UniProtKB/Swiss-Prot annotation:
Record site: Interaction with tRNA: 129, 341
Coiled coil: none
Name recorded for this polypeptide: tRNA-specific 2-thiouridylase MnmA
Cysteines paired by S-S bonds: 104-200
Gene3D superfamilies recorded: Adenine nucleotide alpha hydrolases-like domains, HUPs, Translation factors
UniProt entry keywords in alphabetical sequence: ATP-binding, Cytoplasm, Disulfide bond, Nucleotide-binding, RNA-binding, Transferase, tRNA processing, tRNA-binding
Organism: Listeria welshimeri serovar 6b (strain ATCC 35897 / DSM 20650 / CCUG 15529 / CIP 8149 / NCTC 11857 / SLCC 5334 / V8)
Gene from which the chain derives: mnmA
NCBIfam families membership: PRK00143.1, trmU
Region (Interaction with tRNA): 150-152, 308-309
Subcellular location: Cytoplasm
Active site per the UniProt annotation: 104 (nucleophile), 200 (cysteine persulfide intermediate)
Amino acid sequence: MSTNNSDIRVVVGMSGGVDSSVTAHILKEQGYDVIGIFMKNWDDTDEFGVCTATEDYDDVIRVANQIGIPYYAVNFEKEYWDKVFTYFLEEYKLGRTPNPDVMCNKEIKFKAFLEHAESLGADYVATGHYAQVKKIGDEIELLRGVDNNKDQTYFLNQLSQDQLKKVMFPLGGMEKTEVREIATKAGLATANKKDSTGICFIGERNFKQFLSEYLPAQPGEMRTLDGEVLGKHDGLMYYTIGQRHGLGIGGDGEPWFVVGKDLKANVLFVEQGFHHESLYSDSLIATDISFTTNAEKPKTFECTAKFRYRQTDTKVTVHLRSDGTAEVVFADPVRAITPGQAVVFYDGDICLGGGTIDTVWKNEAKLDYVG
């Protein structure tokens, strides 16, 4: 049932998955002038020598032909390497745990891809993200997707007004089950394709093995904060704050967890117990602060925040500092705050923006062992 949208061109980022397939299908049904673009961001083959990107592009072709839209593949490998993968490696060198999805959305999907789409005459770009945009006056608000389990605003926190004004998220008002139902009803080739998980350029491969191809591993000591040596680690880059698995520490009592790293001494700090006090902090300093609206922000404001994907919101007070960083003070102590990850601010369902966790604090003292 077409409406009068035929003079509005929407370029859809199609990954070969069910979400972007349904996105393209919905927009086509609504009468838009739809073009599908497959972004080739990584030159990759799996352990069987099969290029997973080729398989995904084949699915894009099948779906595009089914719904009757033109499609193209565009190579963003250089941009992805320069803007996302280089950043990913640099963060790991610093002992941090980066979030490449945030950078990919900021630099590739809603920058390089958006610019390419505009060269094709696009009025908007659309993706299969579970998020919503809403026009309020001259501003576009970024809102959580209605499916709490799939909401992806955490990864979109760095988008600007200029980017949001050009974006459509047709799946934002739906549950994942509805999306699958639409795909099945429409007979789309990707209706039963399983969702991709993990970091796109690692895919199904072993994370340690992948990282060691780019960064040399430097094994070292595993110690408690009091200095007791408990074993060896395989390389600091393989561990993240709060991690339990892969430590290889036996014995009685509660499990052991990563609580910090000393990059200079190449030491991994571990402590026993999920709720060990060294895992908790009450504030952080964040860099790369970005807001989704242009509205003037007070120097201090209260909101809620997420410190990792799918985490429950925490009440916080944000103090914007003159050097462009922000101090984020938690209403209650939070476990396993991890440098390199995103801190994302919310006002109800509105995603206000966010930044990158830089340092972690407790009782107004920096926790040097965290990083």
